[in-house]
A protein has these predicted regions:
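Conserved structural motif at the start of ABC-family nucleotide-binding domains
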Residues: 7, 24-28
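Conserved ABC ATPase signature
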Residues: 117-119, 143-147, 151
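Conserved ABC ATPase "signature" region
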Residues: 106, 121-139
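The feature captures the beta-strand-to-loop junction immediately N-terminal to the Walker
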Residues: 42-44
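Conserved small/polar residues in nucleotide/adenosyl-binding loops
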Residues: 160-162
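Conserved ABC transporter NBD signature motif
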Residues: 65-73, 82
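Helix-to-loop junction immediately C-terminal to a conserved catalytic motif
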Residues: 57
Length: 162
């Protein structure tokens, strides 16, 4: 699976609604992102990096063009399906009180656990594996709101490995 084409972008235009119509942020973006490769998105403030990431993760619709993830159009995914193939770590703080790191990472299993969200033994093993992968075992029982910014980012990384 290494170097498999994972995300393919064709003639993508990003933007958002504004006074007097749609504000175009970037247009005619073509790119291919392959699994197993590090991809870096660089640019000056205000050029549309965050808008592009929000569009790629379906938090906002594209103005034009196409996005395919694993050979399937982004618009053809249900929210539940998308949650199993896309993980996003945002820079904003999540303000969660009364939740441990283990419980938060466990929430990453929600696309797989059914309506009630009860974790099976296999789900709990997956949570523990994700925590171990990011090497945050020492944070497992800490309350999320007590974490430093760096610790919180590591927890969010473990969530996307679920």
């Amino acid at each position: 699976m290494m170097n498999q084409e994972t995300i393919h972008i064709r003639k993508l235009t990003t933007g958002y609604p504004g006074k007097g119509g749609t504000k175009i942020v970037a247009k005619d973006i073509d790119a291919t992102i392959r699994s197993g490769e590090l991809t870096c998105l660089l640019g000056a403030n205000g050029v549309g990096k965050s808008t592009l990431l929000r569009t790629l993760s379906a938090f906002q619709p594209p103005v034009g063009g196409e996005i395919e993830i694993m050979g399937k159009k982004l618009t053809d995914y249900t929210d539940k399906q998308l949650a199993t193939v896309i993980g996003v770590v945002l820079t904003e703080k999540c303000s969660l009180r009364n939740m441990t790191v283990e419980e938060l990472v466990g929430m990453g299993r929600s696309p797989y656990t059914g309506f009630w969200g009860n974790l099976s033994k296999e789900d709990k093993n997956t949570v523990n594996d994700a925590i171990a992968l990011v090497r945050i075992e020492d944070l497992k029982y800490r309350m999320v709101h007590t974490l430093s910014d760096g610790e919180r980012q590591k927890v969010m990384l473990s969530l996307i490995h679920i």
